[in-house]
């Protein structure tokens, strides 16, 4: 996703709970518009702190369609938070278990026919596998973050398809630079990913104005340049017994293809929607008068 930096948990489970809020993040991406059966990807992430233990949870639902291929994945993860450093920096270690389902359709097109090709499924074919992800993540709120993670650690094979997911390594980092007090903040982000055979990198920069509006650009060398805009609105209500914090975020990006696909694709659209919250209550202690002073 072009707006990956709005939800680090999608690439690194150890980032769960670092915002101190419970987060519900959704992404929808329509890639390479103009191509028949181009990729359509949806993702829903939920993460937050677990009150009775020093850690956080992460739940992910992922669905992707590309041509005749359909992928569905569900993840359940936990991030253990170490004691904060004196500077306010927090480090976490995370692990997630995923259930991955892959299927292929039958609407194949080939100039020389496909009926007798053993490499092309003749019927609807579905297979599933269980996998494992690990990660480490460090951050200081509103200042910087860095993380390293590995997905498909078990490389469990889809037995009915003879397909094995390949391990992927992700390294991410970012820093926020105040430009005008708290009114303007320059936010930089970078994500490098590799399966040790091929590599890709995402670099982005955006400016957040008045904690409400942001705009910027993301660049994937050899693939796309993407303008990005977004809006957020926060509400904090508190009294003697209750504290309620809510944050709404909405983002949009448009990938302008720079690869050879630009002759066939009009670009890619992506929408990000998020709701974050924190509700706390302080119990009221009963008070009794002393009859000796009545």
Q: What does each model-identified segment do?
A:
Residues 1-294:
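Subset of outer-membrane beta-barrel
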């Amino acid at each position: 996703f072009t707006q990956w930096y709005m939800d680090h948990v999608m690439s690194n489970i150890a980032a769960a709970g670092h915002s101190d809020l419970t987060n519900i993040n959704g992404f929808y991406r329509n890639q390479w518009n103009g191509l028949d059966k181009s990729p359509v990807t949806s993702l829903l992430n939920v993460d937050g702190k677990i009150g009775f233990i020093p850690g956080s949870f992460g739940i992910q639902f992922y669905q992707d369609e590309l041509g005749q291929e359909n992928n569905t994945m569900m993840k359940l993860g936990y991030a253990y938070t170490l004691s904060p450093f004196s500077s306010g920096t927090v480090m976490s270690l995370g692990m997630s278990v995923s259930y991955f389902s892959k299927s292929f359709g039958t609407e194949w097109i080939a100039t020389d026919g496909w009926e007798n090709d053993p490499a092309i499924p003749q019927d609807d074919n579905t297979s599933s596998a269980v996998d494992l992800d690990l990660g480490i993540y460090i951050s200081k709120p509103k200042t910087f973050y860095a993380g390293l993670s590995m997905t498909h650690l078990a490389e469990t094979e889809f037995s009915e398809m003879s397909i094995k997911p390949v391990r992927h390594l992700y390294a991410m980092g970012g820093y926020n630079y105040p430009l005008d007090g708290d009114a303007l903040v320059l936010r930089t982000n970078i994500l490098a990913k590799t399966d040790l055979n091929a590599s890709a990198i995402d670099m982005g920069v955006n400016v957040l104005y008045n904690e409400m509006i942001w705009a910027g650009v993301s660049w994937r060398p050899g693939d796309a340049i993407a303008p990005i805009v977004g809006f957020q609105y926060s509400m904090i209500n508190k009294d003697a017994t209750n504290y309620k914090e809510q944050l709404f975020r909405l983002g949009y990006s448009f990938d302008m293809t720079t690869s050879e696909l630009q002759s066939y694709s009009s670009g890619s659209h992506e929408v990000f929607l998020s709701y974050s919250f924190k509700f706390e209550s302080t119990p009221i202690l009963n008070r009794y008068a002393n009859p000796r002073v009545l």
